[in-house]
Amino acid sequence: MSKLLDKKKFRLPKNASPSKYKIELHPDLKVKTFDGKVEILLNILEESKSISINVAELEIKTIVLKENSTELNNSISWNIDNDYEIMSINFENPIPIGEYSLIIEFSGVLNDKLRGFYHSSFKDHNGNIQSIATTQFESTDARRAFPCFDEPEYKSVFSVSLVLENELFCVSNAAEKNINNEYLKTKDKTLKKVEFHDTIPMSTYLVAFIIGPFEASKEINVNGTNLRIIYPVGKGIYVILLLSLVNML
């Protein structure tokens, strides 16, 4: 018999509210795992010894709380209720009302459930299987990619950065801001870091990104809006046809 859960306990307490997320994720498509770091700029709305956020199927490595870029001298512990997918972050001393940065390092698995940050694949133009990492956060699965206030009433700005192999391509909600093609060098590969512009304030379930063997067309302007078409490597001929049709609009 399945355990009966209290619906009210799925909701987060209202003592803290996020205003911006700075997210950095590094997926490894070969082993289907990812490492991540999120900095949540938040407002503590009442003096608190605990903050609760949503987490599901993530391993939490470190948690730091800063005020004005200075780490607080306040012992931190945490525990995760896997049934309710809520992590309670506990402080030795109460945190006064104010603005803070909550910085969390974590890791996870690229699942095959089409939920959160997951692994998928497709056949390329040569019939070879290609791997991708992509997202499906609606309605409450952003918590499987990064710790967050995963309720739609919380509207925040999102700054996304992705670390990936140089031969891969990625997109997110906003346009690229900066690309460092030599972000990290190892014995057998060089990784790049792609930073995206800030989004408008929005709910967590609207955040999206995809990483894989893709290419992008040149930007075209359609009725005042700049558009690109993202497509698998080797499928460019179809994009040329599509762009010719778009230009007829």
Model-derived regions: residue spans:
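Acidic/His-enriched low-complexity segments
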Residues: 1-249
